[in-house]
């Protein structure tokens, strides 16, 4: 239990930050699913368009340290490889 004024404030801030970060992680997962759905549909143009937006989202979340930079790089790499494999 937070006893000091500062500790109570930090506890309030932590709750607020957690909600914000959770919404960003959810947005990230949703955008990744959209890319995978476009890949499964076989529409390379749509997949590339959605991937560009998703790539931006992944980078923003990694910059804010909500997701680790290596995790972000891995996600982008795997999605990019899946899109490139569609042409083959």
Swiss-Prot record:
GO terms for cellular component: cytosol; small ribosomal subunit. The keyword Plastid does not apply. It comes from the Bacteria. InterPro entries: Ribosomal_bS20, Ribosomal_bS20_sf. One of its GO terms (molecular function) is small ribosomal subunit rRNA binding. Keywords: Ribonucleoprotein, Ribosomal protein, RNA-binding, rRNA-binding. The keyword Ribosomal protein applies. GO terms for biological process: translation. Pfam families: Ribosomal_S20p. SUPFAM superfamilies: Ribosomal protein S20. Residues 1-28 are annotated as: Disordered. Belongs to the bacterial ribosomal protein bS20 family. Binds directly to 16S ribosomal RNA. This is Small ribosomal subunit protein bS20.
């Amino acid at each position: 239990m937070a006893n000091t004024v500062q500790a109570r404030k930090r506890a309030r801030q932590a709750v607020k930050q957690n909600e914000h970060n959770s919404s960003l992680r959810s947005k990230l997962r949703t955008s990744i699913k959209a890319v995978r759905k476009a890949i499964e549909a076989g529409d390379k143009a749509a997949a590339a368009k959605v991937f560009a937006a998703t790539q931006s989202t992944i980078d923003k979340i990694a910059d804010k340290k909500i997701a680790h930079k290596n995790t972000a790089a891995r996600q982008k790499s795997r999605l990019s490889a899946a899109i490139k494999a569609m042409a083959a």
